Amino acid sequence: MSFSVNQPFRWMDSGTYQDSPLEPLIRDEALAASMQSESAAPVIHLWVYDQALYLGRRDAKLPHLQQALHQFGQDGFGCVLRSSGGACVPLDAGVLNMACLLPNTSISIDSFFSFVAQLLDVGLRDYGKLEFGEVTGSYCAGEYDFSIHGKKIGGMAQRRTRHGSILQLCINVDDRPRGEWMEHFYRLAGLDEMQSHKPIPSIDASTVGSIASLTGKLATMDDVKARLLETIRSEWAVSPTPFYVQNELVTESRHHLSQRLHLFSYTAKELAAPDWHLPE
């Protein structure tokens, strides 16, 4: 592999979010902005959101998106339009999100994906052998999916900012009906009614799994976090650090995502309101 990290990673965990689903993405964006500092070091940021649909740009083309989101709001899901990745991913208390941030914009797309795939291969080796490549029929399917025994447990997406590179991924830790949720969501949103130019292929719930369901091992969020840190530290320099990012960068990032990129975000309560509607 043509890329390596010469500085220790700062390992940060900002915990579990339940308010606006945009908040953890704002923290990722603020950390990306912090890469402009001359003393910037690479960061691995962990977080959990309980629970929401993290939509991609392609989902905006669905004919009944508003009705589907309203129904999911009544079922306890918030939603957010995210800036990376192509289609919807369901997040809940059993999904671990991880962002890898580098003060480096010159790394190639493939090299960054390959590097993080190595991190995951080492970090999750106690749970079995990971396979990388598209899992056809899974939600948000793409060539940077990762799976165990052919069933998707997560996926990766990356982008560049002015000051660095950011790769975001999620890992299904415990067993919940995420594939069924996505089948239901796309049915409500009218995917099957679209005769041509479908923005998303059909979803097959059986293609999705989790660490717990596919390995038969006890897999709690705390256990997976601890094993990730322990095994990754065996191969790379990693320094656990309390989560911190400058308030000014958080404010700027909130404005950038919501006002400049027009990423909408709603809690379940907001989505469930009778008068709720998508922004024009």
UniProtKB/Swiss-Prot annotation:
Function: Catalyzes the amidotransfer (transamidation) of the octanoyl moiety from octanoyl-GcvH to the lipoyl domain of the E2 subunit of lipoate-dependent enzymes.
Gene Ontology process terms (BP): lipoate biosynthetic process; protein modification process
Gene name as annotated: lipL
Reaction catalyzed: N(6)-octanoyl-L-lysyl-[glycine-cleavage complex H protein] + L-lysyl-[lipoyl-carrier protein] = N(6)-octanoyl-L-lysyl-[lipoyl-carrier protein] + L-lysyl-[glycine-cleavage complex H protein]
Residue intervals of the BPL/LPL catalytic domain: 38-240
Domain of life: Bacteria
Involved pathway(s): Protein modification; protein lipoylation via endogenous pathway; protein N(6)-(lipoyl)lysine from octanoyl-[acyl-carrier-protein]
Family (UniProt): Belongs to the octanoyltransferase LipL family.
Residues of the site described as Lowers pKa of active site Cys: K152
Miscellaneous field: The reaction proceeds via a thioester-linked acyl-enzyme intermediate.
Keywords: Acyltransferase, Transferase
EC number: 2.3.1.204
Active-site residue numbers: C140 (acyl-thioester intermediate)
Descriptive protein name: Octanoyl-[GcvH]:protein N-octanoyltransferase
GO function term, MF aspect, one: lipoyl(octanoyl) transferase activity
